[in-house]
Amino acid sequence: MSTDSDAETVDLADGVDHQVAMVMDLNKCIGCQTCTVACKSLWTEGGGRDYMYWNNVETKPGKGYPRNWEESGGGWKSSEHKERKPGQIPDKEDYGDAWEFNHEEIMYNGSDRPLRPDSDPEWGPNWDEDQGTGEYPNSYYFYLPRICNHCTHPSCVEACPRKAIYKREEDGIVLIDQERCRGYRYCVEGCPYKKVYYNATQKTSEKCIFCYPRIEGEGPDGKTFAPACAEDCPPQLRLVGFLDDEQGPIHKLVEEYEVALPLHPEYQTQPNVYYIPPFAPPQHSEDGESVDVDRIPRNYLEELFGERVHDALDTIEREREKVNRGGGSELLDMLTDTNPARKFRLEVFDDD
């Protein structure tokens, strides 16, 4: 747990008043894809967006979506954010085409053939779902939900020669000005997480907008709502708020307890989507006895979340032991809280 002053630990981008952020607890994700469906039905149902999944849930270890995105480059060469790393634009096949199925044949023409894609797909956004690694009985996998990270130092912003991508002053959300964008795709190349997508129909790039109309209360009833992916999540694994809200769970999990970590911090973009790293049962010996070895290798988690993952897991384990002995834990209370008013703190700076 950090002992530094809270105000000194929050790094906001230049010109940004507050930074909205999300924490996802990977120990709760069941891979149900409800978040994916919520996002897809709200934002990317057609008009050149068929292949886009602004929110997707990957099985790790796995190649992800788009395929092998972790090997596609992009980001910054150092924390000084002066020189970008070269990146690649994924091929359409790496995303996977939107599948068309023989629904009409089955449902209206009385065919005995099974329901299947009309095409012969070779990849898709959830192609390697539930494919674990390791040897039985110590094989493992876990789910990794991903959206745009709305980074503090987004390399996509710097990559755009049209200055069409920007961070909003009021909340740090990264958006693309569709009037300025010309579809050059330097942003796709520059994003190391490959969370910017090219719309070949509109000839512009598009991405997750953190459901800003929902958090602004632009619905018919004027109420503020969390992003659809967070609001609709059955196991309630997502917390949403502001990184600089010192009383909120986002700030405490990221800055105080330091158990919520960014994905691939070595990309140097400083993401504002954070993850509680996953636990798993211990490994078993050949005779079926539990052994004191992590089933999910710590070195693999370090590849994803950096060297701080060891301290984060140790901190959570200490808090669990404290509760097992009959004590209390603010940390575990935050991670198990189901009250929307505390999980989604989006109106704390409305009077600014």
UniProtKB/Swiss-Prot annotation:
GO biological process: anaerobic respiration; nitrate assimilation
Catalysed reaction, written as an equation: nitrate + a quinol = a quinone + nitrite + H2O
Induction: By nitrate.
Molecular function terms from GO: 4 iron, 4 sulfur cluster binding; electron transfer activity; metal ion binding; nitrate reductase (quinone) activity
Residues annotated for [3Fe-4S] cluster binding in this entry: C160, C181, C187
pH dependence: Optimum pH is 8.2. At 40 degrees Celsius (temperature of natural environment) the optimum pH is 7.9.
Keyword entries, A-Z: 4Fe-4S, Cell membrane, Electron transport, Iron, Iron-sulfur, Membrane, Metal-binding, Nitrate assimilation, Oxidoreductase, Plasmid, Repeat, Transport
Acetylation keyword on record: no
Domain of life from the UniProt record: Archaea
Membrane-spanning parts: none
Cofactor(s) the record lists: [4Fe-4S] cluster; [3Fe-4S] cluster
Dependence of activity on temperature: Optimum temperature is 70 degrees Celsius.
Binding site for [4Fe-4S] cluster 2: C39, C208, C211, C229
SUBUNIT field: Probable multiprotein complex; a catalytic heterodimer of an alpha and beta chain is proposed to associate with additional subunits involved in membrane attachment and electron transfer.
Reported function: The respiratory membrane-bound nitrate reductase enzyme complex plays a role in generation of metabolic energy by using nitrate as a terminal electron acceptor during anaerobic conditions. The beta chain is an electron transfer unit containing four cysteine clusters involved in the formation of iron-sulfur centers.
Name of the molecule in the record: Respiratory nitrate reductase subunit beta
Taxonomic source organism: Haloferax mediterranei (strain ATCC 33500 / DSM 1411 / JCM 8866 / NBRC 14739 / NCIMB 2177 / R-4) (Halobacterium mediterranei)
Native organism taxonomy: Archaea, Methanobacteriati, Methanobacteriota, Stenosarchaea group, Halobacteria
Gene from which the chain derives: narH
